[in-house]
Protein backbone atom coordinates (compact mmCIF):
# COMPACT_ATOMS: atom_id res chain seq x y z
CA UNK A 1 0.00 0.00 0.00
CA UNK A 2 2.42 2.63 -1.08
CA UNK A 3 2.39 5.56 -3.44
CA UNK A 4 3.06 3.29 -6.45
CA UNK A 5 -0.56 2.10 -6.20
CA UNK A 6 -1.90 5.63 -5.86
CA UNK A 7 -3.02 4.86 -2.28
CA UNK A 8 -1.10 6.22 0.68
CA UNK A 9 -1.28 5.15 4.31
CA UNK A 10 -2.72 8.57 5.17
CA UNK A 11 -5.65 7.84 2.85
CA UNK A 12 -6.99 5.49 5.54
CA UNK A 13 -8.29 8.55 7.42
CA UNK A 14 -10.07 10.13 4.46
CA UNK A 15 -13.68 9.37 5.35
CA UNK A 16 -16.36 10.32 2.83
CA UNK A 17 -18.80 12.96 4.04
CA UNK A 18 -21.76 11.00 2.66
CA UNK A 19 -21.19 7.97 4.92
CA UNK A 20 -23.27 7.35 8.04
CA UNK A 21 -21.84 6.48 11.44
CA UNK A 22 -21.96 2.71 10.96
CA UNK A 23 -20.25 2.97 7.56
CA UNK A 24 -17.48 5.20 8.89
CA UNK A 25 -16.84 2.95 11.88
CA UNK A 26 -16.83 -0.10 9.59
CA UNK A 27 -14.25 1.68 7.41
CA UNK A 28 -12.20 2.33 10.56
CA UNK A 29 -12.18 -1.43 11.30
CA UNK A 30 -11.19 -2.31 7.74
CA UNK A 31 -8.43 0.31 7.76
CA UNK A 32 -7.10 -1.01 11.06
CA UNK A 33 -7.03 -4.54 9.67
CA UNK A 34 -5.12 -3.35 6.62
CA UNK A 35 -2.62 -1.28 8.58
CA UNK A 36 -1.97 -3.96 11.20
CA UNK A 37 -1.62 -6.80 8.69
CA UNK A 38 1.83 -8.29 9.27
CA UNK A 39 2.57 -5.90 12.16
CA UNK A 40 2.41 -7.20 15.74
CA UNK A 41 4.07 -4.31 17.60
CA UNK A 42 1.41 -2.85 19.89
CA UNK A 43 2.93 0.66 19.91
CA UNK A 44 2.85 0.83 16.13
CA UNK A 45 -0.67 -0.59 15.82
CA UNK A 46 -2.19 1.49 18.63
CA UNK A 47 -0.58 4.64 17.23
CA UNK A 48 -2.33 4.06 13.91
CA UNK A 49 -5.54 3.02 15.67
CA UNK A 50 -5.65 6.25 17.70
CA UNK A 51 -5.29 8.26 14.49
CA UNK A 52 -8.01 6.22 12.78
CA UNK A 53 -10.37 6.76 15.73
CA UNK A 54 -9.59 10.49 15.92
CA UNK A 55 -10.24 11.11 12.24
CA UNK A 56 -13.32 8.86 12.08
CA UNK A 57 -15.04 10.75 14.89
CA UNK A 58 -13.92 14.13 13.57
CA UNK A 59 -15.48 13.22 10.20
CA UNK A 60 -18.74 12.49 12.05
CA UNK A 61 -18.65 15.97 13.57
CA UNK A 62 -18.47 14.39 17.03
CA UNK A 63 -16.59 16.88 19.16
CA UNK A 64 -14.03 14.49 20.64
CA UNK A 65 -11.09 15.93 22.52
CA UNK A 66 -9.11 12.74 23.23
CA UNK A 67 -8.83 9.33 21.61
CA UNK A 68 -6.30 6.74 22.61
CA UNK A 69 -5.19 3.91 24.79
CA UNK A 70 -4.05 2.95 28.23
CA UNK A 71 -2.22 -0.38 28.43
CA UNK A 72 -1.73 -2.68 31.38
CA UNK A 73 1.71 -2.09 32.80
CA UNK A 74 3.81 -5.26 32.63
CA UNK A 75 5.42 -4.70 36.04
CA UNK A 76 2.14 -3.91 37.82
CA UNK A 77 -0.80 -5.94 36.53
CA UNK A 78 -3.43 -3.69 38.12
CA UNK A 79 -2.09 -0.44 36.68
CA UNK A 80 -2.81 1.17 33.32
CA UNK A 81 -0.12 3.33 31.75
CA UNK A 82 -0.67 5.93 29.05
CA UNK A 83 -0.30 4.58 25.52
CA UNK A 84 -0.59 6.13 22.05
CA UNK A 85 -3.24 8.83 21.70
CA UNK A 86 -4.49 11.93 19.88
CA UNK A 87 -5.41 15.00 21.91
CA UNK A 88 -4.14 16.96 24.90
CA UNK A 89 -1.62 15.54 27.35
CA UNK A 90 -3.18 13.01 29.70
CA UNK A 91 -2.94 11.22 33.02
CA UNK A 92 0.01 8.86 32.93
CA UNK A 93 -1.12 6.06 35.25
CA UNK A 94 -4.53 4.81 36.36
CA UNK A 95 -5.19 2.04 38.87
CA UNK A 96 -7.68 -0.70 38.00
CA UNK A 97 -11.01 0.17 39.60
CA UNK A 98 -10.35 3.94 39.57
CA UNK A 99 -12.22 6.27 37.21
CA UNK A 100 -13.86 5.19 33.98
CA UNK A 101 -10.71 3.60 32.50
CA UNK A 102 -9.87 1.70 35.67
CA UNK A 103 -13.46 0.49 36.01
CA UNK A 104 -13.51 -0.81 32.43
CA UNK A 105 -10.16 -2.52 33.04
CA UNK A 106 -11.25 -4.21 36.27
CA UNK A 107 -14.80 -5.20 35.22
CA UNK A 108 -13.79 -6.07 31.63
CA UNK A 109 -16.95 -4.28 30.49
CA UNK A 110 -17.42 -1.27 28.23
CA UNK A 111 -18.27 1.92 30.11
CA UNK A 112 -20.45 4.53 28.40
CA UNK A 113 -20.64 7.68 30.52
CA UNK A 114 -23.11 10.28 29.18
CA UNK A 115 -22.07 12.88 31.81
CA UNK A 116 -18.65 12.47 33.42
CA UNK A 117 -19.56 15.01 36.11
CA UNK A 118 -22.08 12.50 37.49
CA UNK A 119 -19.63 9.56 37.43
CA UNK A 120 -18.39 8.76 40.95
CA UNK A 121 -14.60 9.00 41.09
CA UNK A 122 -14.18 10.32 37.54
CA UNK A 123 -10.53 11.17 36.82
CA UNK A 124 -10.56 14.47 34.94
CA UNK A 125 -7.47 14.63 32.74
CA UNK A 126 -9.22 17.42 30.78
CA UNK A 127 -11.84 19.45 32.63
CA UNK A 128 -13.65 20.21 29.36
CA UNK A 129 -14.64 16.56 28.80
CA UNK A 130 -18.40 15.99 29.14
CA UNK A 131 -18.84 12.33 28.12
CA UNK A 132 -16.65 9.28 27.63
CA UNK A 133 -16.55 5.72 26.35
CA UNK A 134 -13.97 3.19 27.51
CA UNK A 135 -13.69 -0.28 25.97
CA UNK A 136 -11.48 -2.96 27.52
CA UNK A 137 -9.05 -4.93 25.36
CA UNK A 138 -9.17 -8.49 26.67
CA UNK A 139 -6.66 -11.26 25.90
CA UNK A 140 -7.69 -14.76 24.85
CA UNK A 141 -6.99 -15.92 28.42
CA UNK A 142 -9.23 -13.23 29.94
CA UNK A 143 -6.63 -10.67 31.06
CA UNK A 144 -7.09 -6.96 30.51
CA UNK A 145 -4.41 -5.84 28.05
CA UNK A 146 -5.54 -2.22 28.05
CA UNK A 147 -8.44 0.04 27.19
CA UNK A 148 -9.64 2.21 24.32
CA UNK A 149 -10.59 5.61 25.75
CA UNK A 150 -12.46 8.36 23.88
CA UNK A 151 -13.54 11.66 25.43
CA UNK A 152 -16.13 14.07 24.03
CA UNK A 153 -16.83 17.76 24.65
CA UNK A 154 -20.60 17.11 24.40
CA UNK A 155 -22.88 15.31 26.82
CA UNK A 156 -24.12 11.90 25.59
CA UNK A 157 -21.43 11.74 22.92
CA UNK A 158 -21.51 7.94 22.61
CA UNK A 159 -24.11 5.20 22.21
CA UNK A 160 -24.62 1.49 21.50
CA UNK A 161 -23.30 1.88 17.93
CA UNK A 162 -19.97 3.20 19.23
CA UNK A 163 -19.88 0.36 21.76
CA UNK A 164 -20.50 -2.28 19.09
CA UNK A 165 -17.79 -1.08 16.71
CA UNK A 166 -15.20 -0.21 19.36
CA UNK A 167 -15.63 -3.65 20.93
CA UNK A 168 -14.92 -5.12 17.48
CA UNK A 169 -11.80 -2.93 17.30
CA UNK A 170 -10.69 -4.17 20.73
CA UNK A 171 -10.96 -7.77 19.48
CA UNK A 172 -8.93 -6.92 16.38
CA UNK A 173 -6.28 -5.29 18.57
CA UNK A 174 -6.06 -8.39 20.76
CA UNK A 175 -5.69 -10.52 17.64
CA UNK A 176 -3.07 -8.31 15.94
CA UNK A 177 -0.82 -7.09 18.77
CA UNK A 178 1.82 -8.64 20.98
CA UNK A 179 1.80 -6.81 24.33
CA UNK A 180 5.20 -7.22 26.02
UniProtKB/Swiss-Prot annotation:
It comes from the Eukaryota. It is found in: Cytoplasm; Nucleus. InterPro entries: FRMsr_CS, GAF, GAF-like_dom_sf, Phosphatase_reg/MetRdx. Its EC number is 1.8.4.14. Gene3D superfamilies: 3.30.450.40. GO terms for molecular function: L-methionine-(R)-S-oxide reductase activity. Transmembrane segments: none annotated. The keyword Membrane does not apply. GO terms for biological process: cellular response to oxidative stress. SUPFAM superfamilies: GAF domain-like (SSF55781). One of its GO terms (cellular component) is cytosol. Present with 2610 molecules/cell in log phase SD medium. This is Free methionine-R-sulfoxide reductase. It comes from Saccharomyces cerevisiae (strain ATCC 204508 / S288c).
